[in-house]
Amino acid sequence: MTTTEFPSAVAKARFVRVSPRKARRVIDLVRGRSVTDALDILRWAPQAASEPVAKVIASAAANAQNNNGLDPATLVVATVYADEGPTAKRIRPRAQGRAFRIRKRTSHITVVVESRPAKDQRSAKSSRTRRAEASKAAAKAPAKKAPAKKAPAKKAPAKTAAKKTPAKTSETSDAKGGSD
């Protein structure tokens, strides 16, 4: 965890009719990403839980922009989690007078977005060029010969079992208990 504090904004959606386990599956896709990337990912995610999570992220971004005056381009999903809400219990009638319980789970989704300064493009470019130059230098340098491998020792010829020639058909029928 870093000790530097960035300006942030919070949004919560409570009593959302989605299981916390299913919401966490979607939340894990967007944690630590920029808000625009997160919304793009959730727009195309096939899970039903992606819609309420996207709404909360959009709400947190709007809170950051309107209440705190933060630049929406620098917003990052810093913290996002789903806690368990109350569970509504229903009954499903079953055979012979039995009843099974249906648990309709709810969750509380919390999103914290932070305005992190954009990473310096020069430093990213310089590291990229340094890597490219290093690979070019490695390609130009004469390649070292790999150490010579020892030739595998010749194995002694394996003793071959003497091949038995098939016996005459009359002998084989005698062995099987047949008669001529």
UniProtKB/Swiss-Prot annotation:
Q: What family does this chain come from, according to its entry?
A: Belongs to the universal ribosomal protein uL22 family.
CDD domains tied to this protein: Ribosomal_L22
The entry's function note states: This protein binds specifically to 23S rRNA; its binding is stimulated by other ribosomal proteins, e.g. L4, L17, and L20. It is important during the early stages of 50S assembly. It makes multiple contacts with different domains of the 23S rRNA in the assembled 50S subunit and ribosome.
Q: Which GO terms describe its cellular component?
A: cytosolic large ribosomal subunit
Q: What gene name does this entry carry?
A: rplV
* UniProt-annotated stretches for the region Disordered: 111-180
Output the NCBIfam families linked to this UniProt entry: rplV_bact
From the Swiss-Prot or TrEMBL record, give the protein name: Large ribosomal subunit protein uL22
